[in-house]
Regions:
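Ser/Thr/Pro/Gly-rich low-complexity linker/stalk segments immediately outside membranes or between
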Residues: 22-37
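C-terminal accessory domains and tails appended to enzymatic cores
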Residues: 34, 40-59, 64-68, 201-204, ...
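Divalent metal-coordination and catalytic microenvironments
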Residues: 80-82, 106, 128, 139, ...
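Internal alpha/beta domain cores that form substrate/cofactor-binding pockets in large enzymes
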Residues: 101, 138-220, 228-229
Length: 341
């Protein structure tokens, strides 16, 4: 019996020695890891895209936080929300040398009539990266499932850290009254961070902001419990084609229709797709033209009556009461576009 036990221990020791002596494969980094992650099937829904998304978001070096330029971070629930609501003003800031980051709190992995999971999440991540290149900004997609975002403590910490790490002067997000639960909870998470970004011992691993940012809501059409108030309206005529290019490039959502699409929508190959691209472009053009027309009086307050009358496209924002409350002079510094169309 002792001899058998001894032999078993000896065999185990030999196997352990061989295992420890064998070289371990080196972890892949950079582009090779992104390629590997995009090829491998996800193990759990969209979780397989986590590595690819994190690496993709870190490809660009962070801009200098002390270069005297404005720093803006915009939050959306899905990979397209920020681009729709603030793509124009983001492009204007970026063209003036300021730093803008878009963050999607979910990976959009159920936002299509045909595709889902990791393949769709990877596709949508690629779409926002392309849009970011067109707009001149930085983008990041977090690995939360589409349709499952909740205002948890961990998500509050994540949003707080992102705002602090960006050293934001301006933070944007949706209002909390919205048809989509992910939109509502994105609004809540951004609101919940509005005070916490300055609290030293909340997320002490990231330095608190010395000055609370100005928090702004995107425009919407919801009326209850109260309608959107257009405190700041920015003309986006100089960058409207950039914005439209970015949105048309999100083909999974707009050309193919996202969750509301169907095979019939894109049947007919490239000619049909090109027709759809034109329809999408004109639809978003009409949207931003409608904002300019609706808030013409507010445009006049910022630009003057005559210049405001010439503005064809606009984006509008409401000041959140939870962040810093800027004066009109401060807003002119934060939105340095009002001296020109």
């Amino acid at each position: 019996m002792r001899r058998i036990t001894f032999l078993l221990f000896a065999a185990a020791g030999y196997v352990l020695g061989v295992w420890t002596a064998s070289p371990r494969p080196r972890a892949e980094t950079g582009a090779s890891a992104i390629a590997r992650a995009s090829e491998a099937p996800p193990l759990d829904g969209s979780r397989g895209v986590h590595l690819a998304m994190n690496l993709a978001s870190k490809e660009k070096p962070k801009p200098d936080a002390h270069d005297g330029k404005l720093r803006v971070i915009c939050f959306g629930a899905h990979p397209d929300d920020c681009e729709i609501k603030a793509g124009g003003v983001a492009a204007r800031w970026a063209a003036a040398g300021h730093h803008v980051k878009f963050v999607s709190l979910t990976n959009g992995d159920i936002g299509h009539w045909r595709d889902a999971g990791g393949p769709l999440a990877r596709r949508r991540n690629a779409e926002v990266r392309h849009a970011a290149d067109l707009l001149g900004i930085t983008t990041e997609v977090l690995d939360n499932h589409d349709g499952e975002l909740l205002p948890t403590l961990e998500n509050r910490r994540t949003v707080t850290r992102l705002i602090r790490e960006w050293r934001a002067d301006i933070v944007m997000g949706p209002r909390t009254n919205d048809y989509h639960p992910d939109h509502r909870y994105t609004g809540i998470l951004v609101q919940d961070a509005a005070y916490m970004v300055a609290v030293p011992f909340f997320c002490p691993d990231t330095p608190p902001l010395a000055q609370n940012p100005v928090f702004l809501y995107y425009s919407d059409h919801f009326q209850k419990p109260y309608p959107f108030q257009a405190d700041v309206v920015v003309g986006v005529d100089p960058v409207i084609e950039q914005k439209l290019d970015a949105l048309v490039g999100m083909e999974s959502q707009f050309v193919e229709g996202g969750v509301s699409g169907s095979p019939e929508l894109i049947a007919g190959g490239e000619p049909k797709l090109e027709e759809r691209r034109k329809i999408v472009r004109e639809s978003f053009r009409k949207r931003d033209r409608g904002i300019a027309d609706k808030y013409r009086e507010q445009l006049a307050a910022w630009y003057g009556k005559e210049p405001a009358g010439k503005i064809e496209y606009a984006e509008a924002f409401e000041i959140c009461e939870y962040g810093r409350q800027p004066t009109k002079d401060e807003l002119r510094k934060l939105f340095p576009f009002f001296a020109a169309r």
